[in-house]
Amino acid sequence: MYKKSGQLYYSPTDLTSFMESPFASWMDRFSIEHADKAPGKDPADELMSALADKGYAQEELQQSAFIQQGKTLLSIKGASTDDKYQNTLDAMAKGFDVIVQAHLQLGQFAGYADFLVKVVHSDGDQPSLLGNWHYEVWDVKLANLVRPSFVVQLCSYSEMLASMQGVLPEFMAIVLGSGNKERLRTSEYYSYYKTLKSSFTDKQDAFRADLRPDPADSKSWGDWSGYAKQILLDRDHLFQIAGITIGQIKKLNRAGIETMQQLGESSLEHTSGLQPEVIKRLIAQAKIQRASGGRDVPLFEILSPPQGEITGLALLPPLSPLDVFFDIEGYPLDKGGLEYLWGNTYFDEAGNRQFIDFWAHDQEQEKQCFQDFIAWVYQRWQQDPSMHIYHYANYEIAACQKLMNRYGVCEHEVDQLLRNNVFVDLYKIVKGGLLLGEPRYSIKNVERLYRQKRGTEVASGGESIIVYERWRELHRLGEQGDTYQTSQILRDIRDYNIDDCDSTQELVDWLRLQQEKHVIPFFGKIDVSEPEVPEEITDRIRLRDRLLLRSLAEREKEPVKASLAENLAYCLEFHRRESKPIFWRLYDRRGQSHVELRDDLDCLAHCTRTEREAFKPTARARNLAYEYCFDATQEFKGAQKQFYLLGIETDSGQSAKVTFKSEESDLANGLIVLQSKDEPPSIISLVPDEYVNPNPIPQAIDQIVRGYEDGNLIYGQSAILDFLARAKPRITSHRDGPIAPSQDPDQRLQQITKAIANLDHSYLTIQGPP
């Protein structure tokens, strides 16, 4: 927002700021009205600047794409906003295909749209003020998913555009960082937008400098986060307690607890919406943080695992001389992200600490880097099955899973390492086994217990992104080499990564000392489990490999056939590959505590058996149903029919499962009915079984692919091969040109029907209604 000639003007970004943070929106207005009294904004964020530069580059790519499509473009220029507005109107009237950086305005709202794209009207469409065309707004974003703020901005631009052309565009579009284009129907979001805009303008009209919104009521603080945090710290606000959520703060507030001191001194045991063990943990956390204030080394307390649960230090495996301490440096500003440095601390045969690193500066190198890392750690695990790979938080595991899916490599090895719990997340161990007098449980906070402050040139993961971006720019100019031996910047990043890996190793040593001191045995997985691979799957893998070899052989002389063989080969593994993330998520959930599952909307924690007798839900039912009660304030989707019981196994060693009987349950009032072959325990937590059996689709794909390998499916004589090769449809007696050229709906339908009837072992794509 800004003032011009005493008049306030707003942008679509002001609306999204208000939507996400009433506090930040108020502060923006206050800084305009009372600049002399306003606190300083947050310092410029180098990462945000880098993201902005990437955004401009993304817009240029889209602009180039329009040019390659043969569209006429005009980029709006002008000495003033009034000039730019008039030039935009002139460009719209002249009918350019694409207008770049169009200046739009309506009343007190104004802004620049990345692109206005021309839409030519069909016969019978209502004309706009421009004639038989109008424009729709396209916005370019780096994100890979559509966010609510993007949609609000587009609606605002579309409303301004409607005032200029007389027609509200039917669609608006977002070009995402992945390259995908999302077209959104304006009418589906417009009512929400108008309501939001009305609330925003009402607040602006009623603005008072003495009525600042409480920063605690906003999830973010925009450019004023430093000021907001100081306000809350001055109030001793609950937000500073490690691990506390906004929902928990609100529930504690309703119980009369507003400050960290009040919570630390509280004897509260029960309040609506919070489990007693959660309250107990929050009180203990508040106490130890207050007691640690001003200390060089924070206080800590070791937590023994609750009865019947394997948490905290009980998850820390014994020492192996082949252990690896692992950390990745990632660069999220590339499309899809780039995991560019895989660092590992380990010990050689003489017991000396060593470091090995794998680097990648593009996707081809990333694939090789991933394969090299997995091959190295897998060989060490084969040599000693008691060896583990230690990392802090989930980033490293997520990266391995992402790259395995992206490149289709190392599937067996990653599966085996995950299945046998070779990766050990130290964050889970610390969070479950340690009470720490710090406001966060990041490794930078935890390492205050066992090492001195760092002295590396690169200070944080966020800073490493900026430093690596700087290296990429200098490397493009030929001023930096592409190895740490030829680049000081890469050497600094490597030093930071070594420090991270060494810190991870030192944390394991420190945790192991605490484990021994408090006599907490390891209860994790010891035996190596090999998956039973059905003969059907091994046959499929052999077929895949034969087709990939065939694709390589045909690549130069018959590229179409080579592409067909490659596509068919990867189709064979599609369903098995797609099921892996489901099982990984299941393993992750089954490794969590009852308390942790409470925050998962697909799970249901702490269900307690009611006094209702077990019963048969139907006269013909073979298994009994059991009623449980749970805290109705716990958010639960109830989307699955089958659930695993956390930590419970059957007599045969299988994970116990139950069936959710929705018709017998009353979730709104905290009652759920579960059907089971065996009687479940009196207290249970539910983990969803999200696997959907794809059969018989994989078998049908097998049949098609085997037919291709055996020569029964021939390119040029098969509809499915035509489709995979993107070949033009073969239609008997049809020459080149439109298949259904008529604009008359009835005649066009007849032409389409005739074309389908005359298909010659080919296909025809039909665009149906939305």
Placement of each model-derived feature along the sequence:
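Metal-dependent nuclease catalytic cores that hydrolyze phosphodiester bonds in DNA/RNA
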Residues: 1-121
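Accessory interdomain/linker segments of ATP-dependent helicases and helicase-like nucleic-acid enzymes
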Residues: 20, 29, 33-71, 522-639, ...
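Conserved DEDDh/DEDDy metal-dependent 3′-5′ exonuclease domain
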Residues: 81-82, 95-106, 110-121, 131-205, ...
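Acidic, Mg2+-coordinating catalytic module of metal-dependent nucleases/exonucleases
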Residues: 171-240, 246, 255, 438, ...
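Pre-ATPase regulatory/linker segments immediately N-terminal to the P-loop/RecA-like helicase/translocase core
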Residues: 176, 189-203, 472, 476-480, ...
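Compact, charge-rich alpha-helical regulatory domains located at protein termini
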Residues: 226-300
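A contiguous, basic/glycine-rich beta-loop/short-helix subdomain that forms a polymer-engagement track
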Residues: 283-323, 328-329, 615
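Hydrophobic anchor at the beta1->P-loop junction of P-loop NTPases
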Residues: 766
